[in-house]
Amino acid sequence: MMRRQDKRAGNGIGGWRFWAAAGFSCLLAACGGGSGGEDRSGGSVKTIIARAPAEIAQSSAADYEDNVNGIVTAARLNAWMSNWTGNRPAGITGKLIVFQATVGPAGAEYIKPNNLNVFTYLSPSSEWVQTRSNGVILTPSMVPDGPTMDALLKKYDVDPQNDMIVCAMGTGSTGNAMAQGRCWYALRYWGVQAKNLALLNGGNQWINGNGLDASRFAATASNAPNTGLVSVKSLLDDNTSLQATVEDLLNVLPARDQNVVGDGVMIWDARSTGQFSAGERLEPGENSFTACGGTVCAPPSGYDYMRTFQNNGSRQGHPWGTLQLQFTRMLDSTKGYAYKPKAEIAAYMSGAADSAGYALIDGSYQPVGAGAGYQPGDTVYVYCETTFRAMITGVASAVIMGYPTRFYDGAMVEWSSLSHLPDATGTPILPANSPWRTDVKSFFRQAASATSVATRTIINPYATHANQVILEGQSYKQGNGGGSGGGGTVTPGNPCGG
């Protein structure tokens, strides 16, 4: 038997109250009848606690040097490396495992392992994403399924309940900060506790001399032993609410494209102003655009708005009510693309402008103003094109600020696909009466020619829900089945009927 305690508040379907128990049996609270949030079906007891975004979030110390998880500094890592058994955080009894997304520069290639209780593995972002079906559409770059995660734990011999896992960039860059975030997100989503998980602040080119000296680096990484025995099924936190499905996002959008203060949500687009506006406005330097003297500029005469499109999409723009501030503002390029201080991130999220004038803007392309961004009690929804850039805004929100945060993992590559607009075959991607049309709740500009629009893999345009990824993850933890990777997986029946 599995006992499941749902401590989450909210009314979304995609992972908030709906949980697939053993054999897809119905929870009374989700399917009607009864008053409890636990499955008491018999047998040995296994309690899985469903965590709300507010419980998953963690607030960083004002000074990152004081953190022992979440955002950690090179100085903290140095203390651990010098005497791991003596200096490891309270509650950690296992190994120190560093996942580097890339090789660092010459002389600082890898955080130096001792291969006894400190290990460093090269683990690119491709290991932490997977093409998945949500029951409606096949979407790239989603959180990996259970079998994929277990294969990673086996490959690197990770004990996620006892080891300290540090996601690092290697060479610091915007792309590697995204990869670092994907590592953190996948592990946290699957139930690794905050105390066991950290992100190293800054790339190797900067931390070499700023917290670590040259002796702390090695030219080679540890060899993956492929001897791990622990499964994500042993992790008893259900953190699937960290992911927002397209259904969840549709359910929280306002009735028009405006910033609604006090509605309990802040939706943050991590992309450029050009992508947010579908080319109606640009940022200085965007697409080689020369600065206009401000932070939001009208495009030059004759500008081709299709330059803002990605992944051969049918349209470009944003969901109604979204605020935009590009992810790069969260990082300090002079410090190996480390996160900026917490106070600066708090100011950005409040709506305040920085010294250069960059701030959250709304659908009018005007700054919302200090105090009109994040509101206490809001849940922050973050996205970009494939939720790589949004890993940085999401970490800023969830790991630094400690705000309840959900990652729309399907992102704009999924959102813009769910449209009654033609692809290169001339056929609309979704039928006019599909309930999953996101074009009806979006500002957008259609692709200039359907010939540029790639075909999408639609699984079921009339699916009852779009939470197959969530259900599969919850079911896998209970010992049922695998995942939706690869192609066109058949949507499982609704365990509650209908």
Where are these regions (language model features)?
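N-terminal secretory signal peptides that target proteins for export/translocation
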Residues: 1-14
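A periodicity- and composition-biased signal for non-globular, repetitive helical segments
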Residues: 9-10, 23, 395
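Sec-dependent signal peptide recognition
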Residues: 15-22
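Residue-level signal for mature regions of secreted extracellular proteins and peptides
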Residues: 24-25, 489
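C-terminal motif of bacterial Sec signal peptides marking the signal peptidase cleavage site
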Residues: 29-30
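Cytosolic catalytic domains that perform sulfur/thiol-centered chemistry
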Residues: 33-498
